Amino acid sequence: MGLFGKTQEKPPKELVNEWSLKIRKEMRVVDRQIRDIQREEEKVKRSVKDAAKKGQKEVCVVLAKEMIRSRKAVSKLYASKAHMNSVLMGMKNQLAVLRVAGSLQKSTEVMKAMQSLVKIPEIQATMRELSKEMMKAGIIEEMLEDTFESMDDQEEMEEAAEMEIDRILFEITAGALGKAPSKVTDALPEPEPAGAMAASEEGEEEEDEEDLEAMQSRLATLRS
């Protein structure tokens, strides 16, 4: 506490160092999320291969869409890391300016990076807090809340899912189809007939559905 009960402001250098530490901490969180999503994606890929061998087209489509969503999530997380690196560079510049001018200066580069970072759900809370502190310190201006969220184009998703399944099917058959299938509607390999398989088919389908739902749930949790 300062005089008359007022909170004493932290020195600019201390503020910059604190912001840099918080950003590096969030970068480690993002790295961990990327690894978790990619690890789960490998499991999904194996499940797609298994479903294709059983001739389960619908399961292939659902899982392929999950892979696409996961890859989009990873791309956004990598983009957020790039923005955080921009902010870190901006903090280094602020320290250099501070040594010469004796005060922090407004930065359009930091402003642009923070505008992008506050829109990312995984790190939104921390970035909003940092933005308020930076606004108070005069580094960035007040940012308007951008409520517009771009929606995934359904047709683009369908086409991407078809392309992903085509690629995976071609990989599974080791080129036995002669070429990569052009559409998901192309015939999938038929399951080999077996007497014992017919009796347990219903139970296996229920297990497959449960596994599919569990996998979707895990991926959704990792992306959120």
Swiss-Prot record:
Q: Where does this protein come from, organism-wise?
A: Mus musculus
- Supply the name of the protein: Charged multivesicular body protein 3
**Where is the stretch described as Disordered?**
180-224
Covalent lipid attachment of type N-myristoyl glycine occurs at 2
- Modified residue Phosphoserine is at which positions? 200
Alphabetically ordered keywords of this record: Cell cycle, Cell division, Coiled coil, Cytoplasm, Endosome, Isopeptide bond, Lipoprotein, Membrane, Myristate, Phosphoprotein, Protein transport, Transport, Ubl conjugation
* Source superkingdom: Eukaryota
Q: Where is this motif: MIT-interacting motif?
A: 201-213
Its domain comment says: The acidic C-terminus and the basic N-termminus are thought to render the protein in a closed, soluble and inactive conformation through an autoinhibitory intramolecular interaction. The open and active conformation, which enables membrane binding and oligomerization, is achieved by interaction with other cellular binding partners, probably including other ESCRT components.
Residue segments, region Intramolecular interaction with C-terminus:
2-113
